[in-house]
Amino acid sequence: MDDYTNNLLSKIYVACHTLAISTEARWTAFVLFHRCLNVHSKSSSNTSTCHSNPGDNRKQRLANLASASVFLACKLSNETRRIRDVINVHQMLSFDDTADTTVIHLQDQPPLLDETYWETKAHVVKHEQDLLRIIGFNVTIEFPHRIVVAIWEELVQGQFVQCSKETSYSIIQSCWKYLNDVMFSSICTTSLRASALGCALLSLALEEHGLNDTENLEGLNWYEWVDVTRHEFHHAVNVVSKTKT
């Protein structure tokens, strides 16, 4: 993945935070954009996908698709934001490409309601439609967050894991920390099942706290509760481990 695409992913993360949308809406935005990127990488010369207009600048097209991903994610999550709000955030956030790490600057004022704004609005509407076509109208999203919470509550309530409330809170926070990392990974967001990903997140968090024993009192591995196989579980753990910062 090139630096510009990584910057766009960072921009999506900050934009979602600025728009004050939920964790699940943010996850939806990332999954949608990663699905688009996957098709783009496989069909870079196919004008029926991301190259709906061959004369478009690639960077600008991807930037518009990133904005469209956020806009569509808000709709799908019933957290609708005005298209102007999405455009404002999109245009107000800029990158310092000369830095060793991604540096994001926030302009003091939103863009003016000039011709450029109306052109951008038309682009966002157009690219939302393009985005849907690119991903084959697949807007089904699974959330590893729910898997993490469901399994952890069962482990604690079933007394399979003994820990204090403070440790319990810390474990969940570790899961969310790892989840923030995997949002930047196309493999994690589009190739792993949400159930396997959620189990991997929880396993790594438990390991971090010295509590990683996947076998419960009934002789089963807790990841089997959500129909995750041993192979799938260990593959997911391996993939997620490589994304940890």
What is each PLM-predicted segment?
Residues 1-245:
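Non-catalytic, interaction-prone regions of core transcription and DNA-replication machinery
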